[in-house]
Structure formats: C-alpha cells, structure tokens
Amino acid sequence: MKIFGTDGVRGKAGVKLTPMFVMRLGVAAGLYFKKHSKTNKILIGKDTRKSGYMVENALVSALTSIGYNVIQIGPMPTPAIAFLTEDMRCDAGIMISASHNPFEDNGIKFFNSYGYKLKEEEERAIEEIFHDERLLHSSYKVGESIGSAKRIDDVIGRYIVHLKHSFPKHLNLQSLRIVLDTANGAAYKVAPVVFSELGADVLVINDEPNGCNINEQCGALHPNQLSQEVKKYRADLGFAFDGDADRLVVVDNLGNIVHGDKLLGVLGVYQKSKNALSSQAIVATSMSNLALKEYLKSQDLELKHCAIGDKFVSECMRLNKANFGGEQSGHIIFSDYAKTGDGLVCALQVSALVLESKQVSSVALNPFELYPQNLVNLNVQKKPPLESLKGYSALLKELDQLEIRHLIRYSGTENKLRILLEAKDEKLLESKMQELKEFFEGHLC
C-alpha cells in the first residue's frame, strides 16, 4: 500500500490519520532515520488544526518508544521546521500539517537532517518498514533506553532572526503599509512580529486560530478579503499565507492579485540585478505560463521546467545549481535562505523589490502580460489512468492541432482532477475547457 502522496502523508484526521496509523508511521520513519542518526533528536512542529494534538502525541509516543528524544515546538510554519531541523542539529524534522486543505484534514511532512524534504526513494524505504510487522514489533525499547520528549516554546526567536537576515540590511519597511492574512494558521505569531520589527505599518487579519478555522475563506486560497482590506487600508502591499505558510499570494496597492508567474519573473530579475543568482537558470513547474519563459529569455535568463510540487522544484534547483525557483501557486524557494517554499522569506523579498524599484507595487510587480490560461479543479469520485478513458487520446490530439497547451493530472493530495489549458485565443480556450469538463464529468464523477 502506498502511503506517501506528492507532499508527505495527508488525509482526513480520524479516518486515514488515526492514532494507530500515525504511531506505526512514526515508528517506521524513526527506524529509517536511526540508520543515519548523529544526535538521536527529532524535531516536531505543527500548524493550528485541532487534530494536531492527536497526531503530535501519537508521533511522540512512537518515536520515544524506539529510543528517540523528541523536541516539540508547537505551531510554526513548515519552512521554520526545515530551518530549525538543521539549525538545532536534529536527525530529522516533522511538520504536522495539511497545508491549504480544510481543517478536517491533516498531514505529516518529513525533513532530513539538512532540512530537505525526503526523496521518493526515501519515502519508499519508510513504506517498506511500515509494512514489516516483525521489524516494527522488535524495535521497542525498555527501561532507560526509552526516549524523552520536551517542549521548547522560545525557538520562534531563532526563526525570526533568520527571516530578518534574509532582508537586505540597508533597507527597512518604515515607508510601507502592509496587510497580512495569516489564514488562522502557522504564521499567525511570527509574521506580524517580523514585519513590525522591520518597521512596517502592519494590519493583520485572520490571526485568531481556534483549531477549526484554518484556511476557512481566508489566506492564500481565498485572497479576496485581503484584496478588500488592502484597498480599504490604502496599503502598499498585501500578503496572504496558507495554513503552514510555505505558500504566498501577493496583492498589489490596487487590490489586484499578482499572478504567481509574474512574481517568479520579477523576483528572478531582481535577484539577478543584485548578483544574487548562483546560475542563469530559474526553475518552475510545467504549469508555468509560456510568457514567463519568454520574459526570462529577454533578460538573459533560462527557465528550467520540473514536475509539479515544491520538493521537485527544490531537486531541480540542486541539479541545475540554481538558488531560485518556484510554482505559480505561490511556493517560491530562495535556497540561500530556505530549503523549501517559505512564504515569509518571499514576502520580505517582494517588499525589498518594491522599495528598491521606487514604484508602486501595481507597476513594480507587473513586468509582462500572460498568455490566457484556464485552470479548473474538478472533484472526482475515482482516479483511473487517464489514458484508459475512451476518447481521451483523441481529445489531446485535437488540443495539439489547435495549438492549445494542456496539462491534465490528478491531485496528489485530494480527490481532484486538475485541468490547465493555455492558448492565445481566450474564447477558444473557454469552449475547449467546457468540452473537457463535460468529458471528465461523464467518466470520473
């Protein structure tokens, strides 16, 4: 049975993520990390979901039962776990979060001792241990060999200092009015502190988590409220994070949501202007707009494509010796400061860009026009191989003949089919998307 999806393990708390399942997974992961253990410490953080307590306690029980010492740091962004795992010399880090999913879901993400997400072969190794009944039951410790657990509440300060170091030392935010939407999630404490300490005039919304309101009509997936607040407050910028703050959506001074590909383009060129790029390559996923590639080429930069998912962006960056890349969804990686997407690092870089451009954000963050794209997330009841659907190949052939770029795939974390179309003719795009929706609704819904 395959346990891992495209971003760790994710599912409905109490259904897939039961205490027994989580404990078994915790033992399996712990035994895997034991093979290369240096400090016998594992760090655990979480977002603000109510089920986080259940999952955390199950993991702590599992890891201490095989001799690991566990450090619990409470609600913190996913990128903070990646940073602190390496900074605190832990064998591994674990983030309990389902990211942008509703509060009923939860998930578990693993990081190695260097703060990187696990590769697929490492996940498969954990799955093999998970299914090895004899190994699991022979691994429990007794007496003094059982591990300990302790909670540390002040590590947020380390992460705040780290974030501030990512911001240019010759700048401050005193001239900027900024609205932050923390999605009632993991950034609700740290984001306001960072921006306030750097001098910004800050308004914070959706910063009162109650365990059940994470991502609820707010944050990166629902930035309309942020857009309204930016206009009402006459702010220079608005930043919306998702539940675990590894994703960022930016709103300009006019209340417009800045497209993720425009953000990648303008930030890449900004990094080049500071001689901060380690190579001429910038990494983006196959969902990126063709206009991004053309814009970067005009700036003597090369776009490298990779599979969808920020861990694949990170791997592709390492392969191409690049230190900047991301997804149009808002997972943007500055690897000099973060091993995974970090919404706060990205927000600080956007702020610096706007300051140094000496332009309003609606101008500074609008470097090129995009080709029309249409993205639909279709709820599905089953996930058969797309190639097995009668008429599917003919549909793709027709799209190719019409010069409509297409990317159709199942979500790795939800029961959804993602359909992306891109073409120069917007009306043609809309009509073909309607055809595709009807086709897939007939086969999958």
From Swiss-Prot:
Mg(2+) binds at residues 99, 242, 244, 246. InterPro entries: A-D-PHexomutase_a/b/a-I, A-D-PHexomutase_a/b/a-I/II/III, A-D-PHexomutase_a/b/a-II, A-D-PHexomutase_a/b/a-III, A-D-PHexomutase_C, A-D-PHexomutase_C_sf, A-D-PHexomutase_CS, Alpha-D-phosphohexomutase_SF. Coiled coil: none annotated. Its cofactor is Mg(2+). The modification Phosphoserine is found at residue 99. GO terms for biological process: carbohydrate metabolic process; peptidoglycan biosynthetic process; UDP-N-acetylglucosamine biosynthetic process. It catalyses: alpha-D-glucosamine 1-phosphate = D-glucosamine 6-phosphate. It comes from the Bacteria. Activated by phosphorylation. Disulfide bonds: none annotated. GO terms for molecular function: magnesium ion binding; phosphoglucosamine mutase activity; phosphomannomutase activity. One of its GO terms (cellular component) is cytosol. Keywords: Isomerase, Magnesium, Metal-binding, Phosphoprotein. It is an enzyme of class 5 (isomerase). SUPFAM superfamilies: Phosphoglucomutase, C-terminal domain, Phosphoglucomutase, first 3 domains. Its EC number is 5.4.2.10. NCBIfam families: glmM. Belongs to the phosphohexose mutase family. Catalyzes the conversion of glucosamine-6-phosphate to glucosamine-1-phosphate. This is Phosphoglucosamine mutase. It comes from Helicobacter pylori (strain P12). The gene is glmM.
